[in-house]
């Protein structure tokens, strides 16, 4: 049967003729050397060019990554080799290497060596640790040397292909070839080594339109691959798959089975002649260089072919070799950290007659099925003996050990535990995939149909594009994974049984209530498995998550692509494998899963009984789960982390609990948060205590001013000055009526202009003193501006109502420290919004507008005649004492509503 490998195009980039291509081992980069003289680096994930080096005006026929140095080395037709740093784009080295066109450069995998071959018929070895000195020259070819490549299994040797129709194998340190392979009828263009360990092969491609596979130990031709219609310009053994790739000037790339040498596939992307093939060990990506651009394809899936049984025994395949490891061999004394690679001893179990594309234990772990090449073979897990085989595109197990195979899109066969065919099903649709488990599932690209194993009857059809299917061991839950999300459904087997046993009809949609949708999660699953009622999976973002009751929890962030193997309950660990067959484990407590499951079911008594068996270090995780379910009280009781408990207590309004945590933690942020909460809930004593602990002076200012607490403001003044919080100290002085202290604070803060303006408004008697200071300070910077400042003692005419302001200040000053009770706020709020100076002037105007007396004289004239007109000072005194309120509650500026003149004339101060 042929290999069935999906081939997907991952990059198609048009450019000048690509003479060589290379893949970066860690970055998603393709290196392409162009006939136009430039070297480009393409990002195949973003489909964009990320770097470009203008090497020369002549063709660049070969370039390679030197990743351990972050370099690109390129050989061109101008006979120079150039080295660039691909991060900084700097040119590291340029030197003339040959006397004719450079055809190929090859980088040694471990040593600081680069080989170059040329049309001058020479091969040269360069050592970059010695300043790119030529340390050896290899002579022997009689025509152009088209390609050189190191032997990956013996890096001290390399092979060269030449147009003299030969391939020569050389050793470093020896100027003469070890041997020569001669078999092509025309020039040899390319050569590559087989990377696997079982065959000492190399392959060559020639202008005679053939590729030949050679055994370099017996020096004989093993196979000739014929089929191309033009020169074979590029060949390679794929490092991960049992295939050979050959590229030709006929525009095609042919894929051959590396064991049977059967032609498996032919690719033609319409970009004219093929010039180069690039690949990388550990990857299934292949890059093809054409006349008109570059193509990258991905052959097959990179999921490792591996399976683990319930006891921890893992079996995997590397090509046709079957190997096994056992997690139990790691003793309990070896403490392996989560995510650390397990030191497993690999044992050879045997070989497989077909190339495995899937491998799976049956439910009890006794048998293992290998499926690939359109066939399946069932082996015993311990001795690796063949028990059964047959044709199958896919193979799936049932939960009780039966199995089904998909022979084609129109035929599915069910077999018993004794490997006997029991039933054949011909679905009325094209079955593209099948899945096993409690029910046998067949799906197309649009829907999935579930059938029972016993009779093959359809149970239910669900319209969804299914990528994978995972059944819980209980058989009651199933996960359907699609491209963008996954669905968790409950299987109502009792409903199905009663419907079928009662003779109910099954329509095109099946039994209506067979499945019940429980949850839909918008995440793309890479691999998954069930542990009880908990679904464990890793997603496309490389996170290891588990889902209980629709609630997703991230266990760990993975540093690379991993694939789930299974869960060992006795170790409480879930195991994963990467594509290099490294196995890692992560702790996932079964008791934690059971607890969450019980909570989701509402069985709180059993959940609480299980709680003591969960380690203390996991209690915060439990608490967060309870919080997500809205069970904050229970979460607070279980949580151990003080920060988390504090947050929960604040959410619940449990201020005493939060206060106890804050006392223990002595965190300013916690005290501040608690103080704000206490203030908002009316617990002002606690708010004051918390704000004092937090040294939140702004909060204390708000609290004391709201309470009218003069004593508190006095204490706050001292605290603010000690901490340099001058704004807070100023406001405290102002509200306490200590205007002189306000001025002094402004002066000490070097805010002399502000002090002058304040004194003009509130303490006019201090203006001359402040102006003198202001002049002295300003003299240092701008003498002319300093001279322009006017002193009211010298120029009273420049200061409106100056004498009245002085009189008002003198009368109000004794009453500044007396505070009106808050109950009188309404009286003061109803007063006109005017200053005392304005009030005095308005009073005079009012007196002048009084109606005339009986004699026809107005009051003002009568007063003048009687000589009893009050002085301005007396008038101010009368205004202050006669307005119906008490003790200086009228401010100097008369703004009774805002109380701006007395530094603590807040009506609310008690």
Curated annotation (Swiss-Prot):
Biased composition range(s): Acidic residues: 865-884
GO biological process: endoplasmic reticulum to Golgi vesicle-mediated transport; intra-Golgi vesicle-mediated transport; intracellular protein transport; retrograde vesicle-mediated transport, Golgi to endoplasmic reticulum
GO cellular component, one term: COPI vesicle coat
A Pfam family: TPR_COPA_B
Region (Disordered): 865-910
Principal subcellular localization: cytoplasm
Protein name, entry field: Putative coatomer subunit beta'-3
Classification lineage: Eukaryota, Viridiplantae, Streptophyta, Embryophyta, Tracheophyta
